[in-house]
């Protein structure tokens, strides 16, 4: 990450500053603990930037820990994807990668300690009965008939669970806390359950697995985490976090702090909903450029620096709010405006024939890669008698506000000559197929000699030398700002979130590598698709338009 990216301030950093100043901690140690059951999304990026950013700014450490206690939903594929995403975002984890499964033996021992202290018991109620006995927010829970078993009996039953003596759902280990607590999480939560599932790290060693709330706090303590930072939905869980650590023999006592998660307009963040989009083929996979996943954003053309900048701009607070999608687009637009080389591409082509230009001549024009950055160099663009221009850049008649090509009037071709539309040719349906023009051969890089004003400039590519390309115009995945609030979120999908065009690009783009970004002049920012683009079949993804036009129509 660039040192030029300014250090932010927020309430968590203020807590850390105080802890360091009063000697509560001498250093800072954070962690990012994803469950490897899916692909990371832009909401995770906020947590990554917060946890790794804090460690970076305070010369501390940040662990990457996989919270892998649910083997049925986890996979090595997700482990590798998460590692790649964190690295791509510009961060390095401290030491070796951690897994909660590394601590399964230790976690088991702590569960035994709670049993010996009379603070945990094996319950043989069914999952439905446990839910029923737990009560509601308005009604206290009631004790399980198995709650008062002796430690000796519970130890024997827990060993039986470990040894495969219970079927799934027939027994679990619960913490013995308070069934009348006003906090549901404290009503004897389940801390171990039976699962006969192969684990991607421990194979078939275990048939019992610890629950998140039991595992998380102990993993933090074992790793020496000083500040355990999570989102607000875990605020009540902090009571259980502290209870577990207070009742086992362990040296480190981390503190949990909560911040508001990221809610972004025109998308969903729920893994369940994202998975539904993939499973029902409503998108083309987890890395579909319309998805809010980091891999999807990356494929669409978002840079790691733009995502870090977005996370910095939205800040870290305890207040839940909805962030405008335009804020994310603004970050990548600013980045690419500064750093993306320019190129010309015609997305909806119509042919121009310059009748007074020699048919056999191929002129090589030198064009700057960036108007404000000469250090980015130049490229060669071929100019020929026939060129493609955008269909929208020509009208038979137009008012004075239209600064493009009009029949009988002039316009400048970007980096080339002034041309004049002399006549047109139409097909049987009345559609214009060809525009016949003349050119002023004294206007390459200069104004007309007679002083006449040519105000419009349009882009173009050589019809003979341009490369055909598939152009994918990506837009917001949903038509409403908060699709998650809809009765059927899938019904709010934007049918125009992907429009595919067959256009032409200048030949220099054949050299573009996967994820290479360009500004297609006057059109938007695009990148080479990392999955489908090939040397003989180019594919470009629109990352973002030149300006925010969502919900706006042309005047």
From Swiss-Prot:
Similarity remark: Belongs to the class-I aminoacyl-tRNA synthetase family.
GO cellular component: a single term: cytosol
Species in which this protein is naturally found: Vibrio atlanticus (strain LGP32) (Vibrio splendidus (strain Mel32))
Organism lineage string: Bacteria, Pseudomonadati, Pseudomonadota, Gammaproteobacteria, Vibrionales
UniProt xrefs under HAMAP family: Gln_tRNA_synth
Gene3D superfamilies from the UniProt entry: Glutamyl-trna Synthetase, Domain 2, Glutamyl-tRNA Synthetase, Domain 3, HUPs, Ribosomal Protein L25, Chain P
Residues given in the record as ATP binding sites: 35-37, 41-47, 231, 261-262, 269-271
Protein name, as recorded: Glutamine--tRNA ligase
Record-linked InterPro entries: aa-tRNA-synth_I_CS, Gln-tRNA-synth, Gln/Glu-tRNA_Ligase, Gln_tRNA_ligase_bac, Glu/Gln-tRNA-synth, Glu/Gln-tRNA-synth_Ib_cat-dom, Glu/Gln-tRNA-synth_Ib_codon-bd, Glu_tRNA_lig_a-bdl
PANTHER family referenced in this protein's UniProt entry, alphabetically: GLUTAMATE--TRNA LIGASE (PTHR43097:SF5), GLUTAMINE-TRNA LIGASE (PTHR43097)
Motif segment ('KMSKS' region): 268-272
Ranges spanned by the short sequence motif 'HIGH' region, renumbered to the chain: 34-44
């Amino acid at each position: 990450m660039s040192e030029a990216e300014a250090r932010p301030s927020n309430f968590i950093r203020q807590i850390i500053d105080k802890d360091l100043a009063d000697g509560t901690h001498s250093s800072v140690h954070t962690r990012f603990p994803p469950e490897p059951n899916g692909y990371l999304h832009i909401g995770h990026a906020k947590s990554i930037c917060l946890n790794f950013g804090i460690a970076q700014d305070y010369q501390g450490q940040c662990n990457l820990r996989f919270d892998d206690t649910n083997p049925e939903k986890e996979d090595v594929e997700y482990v590798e994807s998460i590692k790649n995403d964190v690295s791509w975002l510009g961060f390095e984890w401290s030491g070796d990668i951690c897994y909660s499964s590394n601590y399964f033996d230790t976690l088991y021992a702590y569960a035994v300690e709670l049993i010996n202290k009379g603070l945990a018991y094996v319950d043989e109620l069914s999952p439905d009965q446990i839910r029923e006995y737990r009560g509601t927010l308005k009604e206290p829970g009631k004790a399980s008939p198995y709650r008062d078993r002796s430690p000796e009996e519970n130890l024997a039953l827990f060993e039986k669970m470990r040894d495969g003596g219970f079927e799934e759902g027939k027994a679990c280990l619960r913490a013995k806390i308070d069934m009348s607590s006003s906090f549901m999480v404290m009503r004897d939560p389940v801390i171990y359950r039976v699962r006969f599932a192969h684990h991607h790290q421990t194979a078939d060693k275990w048939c019992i697995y610890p629950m998140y709330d039991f595992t998380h706090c102990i993993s933090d303590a074992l790793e020496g985490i000083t500040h355990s930072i999570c989102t607000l939905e875990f605020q009540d869980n902090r009571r259980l976090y502290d209870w577990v650590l207070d009742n086992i023999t362990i040296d480190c006592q981390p503190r949990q702090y909560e911040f508001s998660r990221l809610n972004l307009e025109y998308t969903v963040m729920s893994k369940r909903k994202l998975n539904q989009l993939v499973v029902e083929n409503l998108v083309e996979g987890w890395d579909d450029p319309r998805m809010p996943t980091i891999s999807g954003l990356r494929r669409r053309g978002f840079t790691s620096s733009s995502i870090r900048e977005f996370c910095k701009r939205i800040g870290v607070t305890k207040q839940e709010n909805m962030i405008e999608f335009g804020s994310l687009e603004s970050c990548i637009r600013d980045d690419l405006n500064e750093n993306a080389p320019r190129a010309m591409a015609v997305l909806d082509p119509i042919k121009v024939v310059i009748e007074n230009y020699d048919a056999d001549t191929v002129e090589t024009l030198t064009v700057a890669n960036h108007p404000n950055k000469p250090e980015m160099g130049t490229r060669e663009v071929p100019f020929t008698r026939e060129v493609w221009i955008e269909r929208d850049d020509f009208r038979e008649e137009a008012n004075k506000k239209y600064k493009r090509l009009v029949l009988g009037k002039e316009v400048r071709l970007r980096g080339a000559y002034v041309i004049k539309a002399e006549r047109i040719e139409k097909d049987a349906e009345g559609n214009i197929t060809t525009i016949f023009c003349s050119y002023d051969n004294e206007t390459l890089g200069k104004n007309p000699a007679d002083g006449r004003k040519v105000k419009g400039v349009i882009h173009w590519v050589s019809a003979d030398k341009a490369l055909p390309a598939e152009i994918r115009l990506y837009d917001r995945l949903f038509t409403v700002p908060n699709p998650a609030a809809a009765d059927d979120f899938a019904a709010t999908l934007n049918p125009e979130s992907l429009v595919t065009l067959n256009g032409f690009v200048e030949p220099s783009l054949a050299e573009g590598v996967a994820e290479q970004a360009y500004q297609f002049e006057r059109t938007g920012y695009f990148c080479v698709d990392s999955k489908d683009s090939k040397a003989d079949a180019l594919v470009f993804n629109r990352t973002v338009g030149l300006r925010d036009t969502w919900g706006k129509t042309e005047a």
